[in-house]
Amino acid sequence: MISQISIKTKVGWITAFEQKNKIIKVKFIKKKNSLISNNLKKFRSELNNFFAGKHKSINCRVLLRGNSKQIKVWKELKKIKFGKTKTYGEIAKKYKLSPRHVGKICSQNEILLIIPCHRV
């Protein structure tokens, strides 16, 4: 069963979807809250602290759903510190992929903000 929480932020509504107590998707939409777990409550707190400037990342339990290349790239994105960026080329070189392939993998990231594809 998938549960969800919607949070109003200064950039609009953000909804996190969870399955098996792990976040599987974050979208910029508003949905009706359902079965709010401790992990979703933590996401709400982390998100609010992130936008308040108290935290530099959002740390919650996530379930990465993808192939091995996607998961490697997404884990690499998670390592990019707040205020820093990397290029598609830098990540591609590390995993012997083309920059376009890395770009495509970034576009398939469903866990926005937690996996910071906006830093690439």
What are these regions (language model features)?
Residues 113-120:
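Short Lys/Arg-enriched helix C-cap and helix-to-coil transition segments
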Residues 107:
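Residue-level detection of the helix-turn-helix DNA-binding "recognition helix"
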Residues 1-97:
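Basic nucleic-acid-binding alpha-helical/helix-turn surface characteristic of O6-alkylguanine DNA
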Residues 110:
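Acidic, glycine-rich catalytic loops of TOPRIM or P-loop NTPase phosphate-binding modules used
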